[in-house]
Regions:
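Outer-membrane beta-barrel proteins
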Residues: 1-324
């Protein structure tokens, strides 16, 4: 489990987002069970309990020589946009400050059926996964085995022209369309090198006549001795009905990071993340949100002490809203 002490501040010209110091402890745990069938196949079940003491993410999988099949409830996202991160604490955009960085759409917030290939089936360490959301227009719910469906209208929420909220930076979320399919491929072609990509496609998105929604990313990492580096790109196109004002139509992101193991106990890292939105016209100015982090972690047995200094430029895609 983790505990943290956060000290936010800001120096931007577009307003001050100073907040009081934050102190917290991990407030979620997982209940799990697994076993083996008479035919040699294995099964696994997991259920998360979150801070509100309610059932959260869940999954039930069956694994054999054919690979893994499973039902994933509100988890099992296949996006790879953050897989390359080498930060020793966490990505700069995944800390206590809600800077609102948008990456890609993902089915981790949906209920999905998934298939994963066996780890040793293909050469060069190639593995593939596919997730299918049969009701993409509905948010995931923690269903029992008696779950029933609801009306699937295939609609979507229009994107906004500027920042909307940290939960939905540009208004539109992955909850849209009648169905959605997410593909992921990873490989380890040579020692130290890993590469991968994902692509998410929607079907039956009603009235997305000007632009259909899609998103994806690719990444690469390389490790040699005490050094490791990572790089990734991500792209998202929002569903658009027709020109209406000046909606955000796409977001492109770039991330790179490097880590160094000073010794068996101490590691340091640097990461830079950028997210650049693009609108239908130049009427609305776009500002690139940038997050950088310098971090260090020291491990003693089963305990890790870590410190991070993260900086944000144009937080919430707002010009001059800079924080530390």
């Amino acid at each position: 489990k983790r505990q943290s002490y956060a000290i936010p501040s800001s120096d931007g010209a577009s307003g001050v987002i100073n907040a009081d110091k934050g102190l917290g402890v991990s407030n979620e745990f997982t209940l799990s069970a697994s076993g083996e069938l008479d035919n040699g196949m294995t099964w696994s079940y997991a259920q998360d309990i979150d801070g509100a003491t309610v059932q959260d993410d869940a999954k039930l999988t069956l694994t054999g020589g054919f690979g893994t099949v499973g039902v994933f409830i509100h988890e099992g996202g296949l996006d790879t946009d953050n897989t390359a991160s080498q930060s020793v604490v966490s990505r700069p955009s995944d800390t206590s400050y809600n800077e609102g960085m948008f990456d890609t759409f993902d089915l981790g917030g949906h209920n999905t059926l998934q298939y994963h290939t066996p780890a040793d089936l293909l050469p060069f360490g190639i593995t593939a996964k596919i997730a299918y959301a049969p009701a993409a227009s509905s948010a995931a719910s923690i269903n029992s085995y008696k779950a029933t469906g609801s009306a699937n209208l295939g609609t979507f929420t229009a994107s906004t022209a500027a920042f909307n909220s940290t939960a939905a930076p540009f208004g539109q979320t992955s909850i849209m369309g009648k169905t959605a399919t997410h593909y992921q491929v990873k490989a380890a072609p040579i020692d130290g090198l890993t590469v991968g990509a994902d692509y998410l496609d929607y079907d039956g998105v009603v009235n997305s006549t000007t632009q259909s929604p899609e998103s994806g990313s690719y990444y690469a990492t390389y490790a040699a001795g005490p050094f490791s580096v990572g790089y990734s790109k991500n792209f998202t196109a929002f569903a658009i009905n027709a020109y209406s004002g000046d909606l955000t139509e796409s977001v492109e992101g770039t991330k790179y990071s490097v880590a160094f193991n000073v010794n068996d106990n101490l590691s340091i890292s640097y990461e830079n993340e950028e997210s650049n939105p693009d609108n239908q016209t130049a009427t609305t100015a776009n500002y690139t949100l940038e997050a950088t982090g310098i971090q260090a972690a020291y491990t003693m047995g089963g305990m890790t002490l870590a410190i991070a200094q993260n900086e944000f430029t144009n937080a919430q895609y707002t010009n001059g809203l800079n924080t530390v």
